[in-house]
């Protein structure tokens, strides 16, 4: 324990392990109190002294001044503990006025508003009475029968006052007991036998068959059991004594004009005391009952107002209005409440803020701190040094010396700040890189200087941004700042493991310019053998930086025979600029000259920084980055790149492309007028045509702009965009191409595009259309920033207690990872997905059977390369979702800590990192919406499938018919085209929609770019399987089908309308039937009749009696016009997924494998679908689909478990129920990543998996077995496993359960820690629940520990807790514990020296000392 004392660790905050909460009994309130308060007086208006016996009474609460009684008789420390015989005040510290409580003895009991009105009403549940009735007893003067004695009245019956008087007259004065007000409720609660109620409810639960009744019983039973288990008594919910807060927590402050500013609580207490005293006096006078009842009601309302003003039945002033008085609940909840304002976030001393300016001369670990600021911040340090050196005798003189800025002060300041890191923070701090440590360098001026490379981590720019400075004071804080938070230790981004200290903007432009090469061949190419000669030639202007030269490059390789390295040289064709860049590279065999001998854009430069980090380690990377930055800045200035109007080159082909598009659009208009296409089809085709036209113009513009010109060399704007320094192809397209389509605020695309570009200038109409996008961008920014910030807060709250608690949980479970293919193209390779994960099983090469990776081994870059060469298409890796560690996760299931590039350290708060990684880009993207200027960024709908490589085709679930033109038409709803390589490994898989034309056969070999299939992207067809004659069934004009006349074309289409709106439409089943020449219904290959059911909104393509051929389209269902997809649409999608909300019109998922059969009858407004299982012994599963919804299956189709039966997004809860956790994880990850990928943001899957793990912490009991659980109860997974294990040990049957998915808000509120839940949302509800359940908080998470003022149990705090545990054990336990846990921990920590070791710090050459 001595070691802990060294850090002052055994403070009060450390001396307890749990926090318990329960309802305060009247006895405990009196025991806590130092005296009863009966007087409302506060201070004397003349002397301003506090009044005795009043709300600030010093006799009860303690002295106002330290060690001084009220009358002044005793005035020194030596009298401590003495109680003055004159004024009765104890002589002690005035601090006791923050701790000592008082109380009010109520004349009549009152109900506690939290237990009465916080839904579900706890009092109501115990008494089995509706809240309305209880309120009528409390507030309206109704009576409740407590004991009917010999009358026909029943116990608990509520009667009005007139009925009560009538009963008294009928049965006599004492023939029954009935009471009103809180006394009545209290009497009922006192008489409750909770154990008997519990037994009755359990037997009722077993016998009931009604689901609704069962839910009601379970709710009540849970409350009854909580009361029994917690030891709380029901009558304690009715107050007979009210505690009074210590006076210093509700102070009386005098304002400048002498008037007192009174805390709202004092107002509430005065009202209660006044009404209580008045009621007491009234009772002595024996007045009419109505007066007493009214006074009791007023007392009840006054107490309600004190505890929770918002829950009173009559609220005179609503929250936020002028006369509103804050209640105790208001003090706790919300952003300004005690939890969030004072406990989770505090204002800090030793801090300052100022504007930031760029500091290009700083090293990466430095920041420029203004001298004046440093002087103020380090004042106490300077004072102590001045005293220590004997320069001044007192602190007062030292302060004066600092104020006068004497020369000695500056010398001491230099000494003080040496090796003393400071923290810089820029708001909003969206991820952990928003606060970093730097070594301060004193500068003149008043602005903080920031290193340019850390700007992207802070998301800072120099247009007036401000940053805050904080000083770590204690030795431990300085140590943590230097080892963990130093900017040089934060090179990689925690969200994706890519370098975040990468050059950008000017630096990129400078390096790009440096690596350019002249396109014009020189008359003679000069040879150089040494770099000094190249520098000499450059100085003499014999060559230019971009000139082509030949250079003798020396190489060194390790010889295979083990005789040491071999040296050789080679002539390379390069430029002086590239050689100059090569000089700053560190020496390593992975870093070859080929890396530099190319034009470097931002992508290549990022890859180089990454490679340097992986190969040479941290200190080399830091040095390299600094040198790269200096070089970039230098050559960006020297290049003379500028931005001119004539640099925006408008392509000559623009007019041609616009004319062609206009012609096509006229064609579409004609087709529409002829009735060949519908209105929405025409709209979609127009949008697509303009998108194509814009893209063609952009392509031609890029071609024109990227031409190398002998006079002006490369185009400046092209260089900026191509290098990735500033601007994008889409912005250039708007400058010199064509602005393109614009979106309305609703998200619809306006079909008239903006043909002009910014160089030509927009006309009035085009300018007006542009305003939509600009305005939407600004409005989005304002609204969505708040949404995104709130999402981050919820994510942090749900994941904050997810910490790495052990190295290996020994599980063999995991998920099979595959590359992500979207629209036939690989959007995320398998390499990227498995890098940094741990193999769940041994991985072998499928051909050579060579072992590539052992189970439990980390897959690093080298192993990824092996797996790629082996051609594996799926790899099983461990995942946080399958981790079996208790109260956290294990290091191996998490894998690599992306910020350090090695297995994650034990004690790492991976939950918070995951939440920040997912939340941070959301905010960034929403702030960035308007940069594209709102031009419609919609891609052209994919309508075909092209082979991306030479391969063999494999068709899965293909059911094909041939139409009259000989085309193969896909009739299957789940047809997949798989492309296999020569070995037979799956390289690409694409689903082909129903109705597509197929150009290949199963087993056919295809060449790259060969077309495999195509389809109409704007409509969903219904296609005949056989040749025959169409017959309309239940398609009645004016009821189920309408001739919809298009006014603009005069053409009418036959559209199916909602037939349920008509009286005669109730039993209709609109369908097309296929008959033969005799009029008999044709039987399909599945053995079913050819009935084609038509949904609402479908357009019929055939007439009644028309002959059709197999493969003909008989009905078209238009798809909706596609809206613009940007993160504005994307952020709500991410929120919807994390909140596990049921999509508005969600698709129905098949629970089993089987054949589709449509029910013969309609069930009210629903349509029946049966899935008939393959096994005839099993009964079919019935689904009810809303009438008119388009089912995407036909009668007789075979569907697999988990297939969709109708259009729409599947419900995540259904996926979990039907297909399990892995399928749910795959779906959620795919959907969330799709939104981020659309914006070019990369987040590692493991972060989403960590959040999902927290969302899957609860299970639902469906069979309790011999346990005490109830059916339908939601319980923690760990708790159930523990209970089941105990049950099995004693030979009893365990509980059976299914996993459930909770949204992040629900999961945060259902956490085991009531302290954490209360500080999140619904504070009063959470505390009410916790109090009557007598909950314990074991303080496992981060938030709870911050609130109680301890070190968080992550990082340093995690190890401290280990040491604390060790120190409390006796010798035998100690050695056992040490061998099992600590040994393991020590070995891992040693292995993780890379994250904290001195050698990884900044090396001497960069200006810092090894620490």
Swiss-Prot record:
GO function term, MF aspect, one: zinc ion binding
SMART domains assigned: RPOLA_N
Enzyme Commission number(s) of this protein: 2.7.7.6
InterPro entries: DNA-dir_RpoC_beta_prime, DNA-dir_RpoC_beta_prime_bact, RNA_pol_asu, RNA_pol_N, RNA_pol_Rpb1_1, RNA_pol_Rpb1_3, RNA_pol_Rpb1_3_sf, RNA_pol_Rpb1_4
One Pfam family linked to the record: RNA_pol_Rpb1_3
Catalytic reaction list: RNA(n) + a ribonucleoside 5'-triphosphate = RNA(n+1) + diphosphate
Gene Ontology BP, a term: DNA-templated transcription
CC annotations in GO: DNA-directed RNA polymerase complex
CC cofactor: Mg(2+); Zn(2+)
Binding site for Zn(2+) 1: 69, 71, 84, 87
Keyword entries, A-Z: DNA-directed RNA polymerase, Magnesium, Metal-binding, Nucleotidyltransferase, Transcription, Transferase, Zinc
Gene3D superfamilies, A to Z: 1.10.132.30, 1.10.150.390, 1.10.1790.20, 1.10.40.90, 2.40.40.20, 2.40.50.100, RNA polymerase II, clamp domain, RNA polymerase Rpb1, domain 3
Highest taxon above the source species: Bacteria
Binding site for Zn(2+) 2: 809, 883, 890, 893
Chain residues that bind Mg(2+): 461, 463, 465
Entry note: cofactor: Binds 1 Mg(2+) ion per subunit.
Family matches, as NCBIfam families: rpoC_TIGR
Function noted in UniProt: DNA-dependent RNA polymerase catalyzes the transcription of DNA into RNA using the four ribonucleoside triphosphates as substrates.
Family from the record: Belongs to the RNA polymerase beta' chain family.
Quaternary structure annotation from Swiss-Prot or TrEMBL: The RNAP catalytic core consists of 2 alpha, 1 beta, 1 beta' and 1 omega subunit. When a sigma factor is associated with the core the holoenzyme is formed, which can initiate transcription.
Protein name, entry field: DNA-directed RNA polymerase subunit beta'
Species of provenance: Ehrlichia ruminantium (strain Welgevonden)
Lineage, highest ranks first: Bacteria, Pseudomonadati, Pseudomonadota, Alphaproteobacteria, Rickettsiales
Gene name for this UniProt entry: rpoC
